[in-house]
C-alpha cells in the first residue's frame, strides 16, 4: 500500500508517498502503475537492513539507496544533569536555531537524494524547527547560539530525539553531551522508559558520540527512494 506523505507533499510541492510495506515483485509493479496514475512523483521506503530480499525487490523496481540509518536506544534511568546552562527554547528562539542548523545535517538523506535540491534540503530542516514548536509532544532545548536538541514523546513510555545539532565552531566543547543530558533528564521526568535517536551509518563521529554516552544499537535500516518519471506513465 502507498500512503501519501501529506506534509512532505505540501512542503516540496510535489506528490510524495511511502510504501507502508514491501510487497512481492508483481504486487509492487501494480502499485507503481497505480502510483503513476495517482500522480505521485516520488516514493520512499524504509526497511530493516536484515530484509535483504525486500531491498532486492525495491532495487529491481528502480528504487535506489538514499540512506543507511543506525537507531540507538537508551534508558533514561540515571540522574543526568547538564554541567552548563541548557534552557528550553521558545518560538522567539526559532531564528537563532535555524541559523545554527544551516549545513549541519549534510549526512541526511535529503542532501543525498537527487530528487531533492540542496536548497530544498536546507529549507526542510528550517521548516522542521518551525513545526517542532507547534507540536505539543515536542520540547526543544538549547545552549544559546551554540546548539539545540529536540525531544519527542512517541508514547507514554517511549521518546525520540529527532534532531540534535551543535554549531561547527562550538563542536568538541561538551555542548552536545550536555544537550543530551538535558534531554535524558526531560524524558526521565516525563516517565519515558526508553529513548531512541537515529543517525547515518557514515557519520562515525555521531555514532561514537552516542556509544560513549551509553546508547546501544537497536537496529539498522535502509531508506530507498524512487522517482516516478513522466515518460514511463
Name every feature range the model reports, one short phrase each.
Residues 50-65, 173, 177, 189, ...:
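Conserved active-site alpha-helix within GNAT-family acetyltransferase domains
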Residues 110-124, 130-166:
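A conserved beta-strand-loop-helix scaffold within acyl/acetyltransferase catalytic domains
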Amino acid at each position: 500500500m502507498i500512503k501519501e506523505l501529506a506534509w512532505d507533499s505540501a512542503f516540496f510541492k510535489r506528490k510524495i508517498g511511502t510504501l507502508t510495506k514491501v510487497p512481492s515483485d508483481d504486487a509492487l509493479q501494480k502499485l507503481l502503475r497505480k502510483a503513476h496514475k495517482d500522480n505521485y512523483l516520488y516514493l520512499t521506503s524504509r526497511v530493516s537492513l536484515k530484509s535483504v530480499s525486500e531491498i532486492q525487490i525495491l532495487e529491481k523496481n528502480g528504487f535506489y539507496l538514499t540512506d543507511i540509518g543506525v537507531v540507538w536506544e537508551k534508558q533514561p534511568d540515571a540522574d543526568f544533569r547538564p554541567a552548563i546552562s541548557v534552557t528550553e527554547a521558545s518560538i522567539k528562539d526559532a531564528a537563532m536555531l535555524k541559523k545554527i542548523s544551516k549545513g549541519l545535517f549534510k549526512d541526511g538523506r535529503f542532501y543525498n537524494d537527487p530528487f531533492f535540491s540542496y536548497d530544498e534540503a536546507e529549507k526542510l530542516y528550517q521548516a522542521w524547527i518551525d513545526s517542532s514548536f507547534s507540536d505539543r509532544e515536542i520540547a526543544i532545548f538549547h545552549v544559546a547560539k551554540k546548539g539545540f536538541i529536540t525531544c519527542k514523546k512517541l508514547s507514554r513510555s517511549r521518546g525520540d530525539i529527532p534532531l540534535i545539532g551543535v554549531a561547527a565552531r562550538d563542536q568538541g566543547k561538551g555542548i552536545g553531551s550536555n544537550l543530551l543530558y538535558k534531554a535524558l533528564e526531560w524524558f526521565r521526568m516525563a516517565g519515558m522508559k526508553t529513548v531512541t535517536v537515529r543517525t547515518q551509518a557514515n557519520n562515525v563521529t555521531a555514532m561514537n558520540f552516542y556509544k560513549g554516552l551509553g546508547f546501544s544499537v537497536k537496529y539498522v535500516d535502509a531508506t530507498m527512494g524512487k522517482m516516478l518519471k513522466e515518460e514511463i506513465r
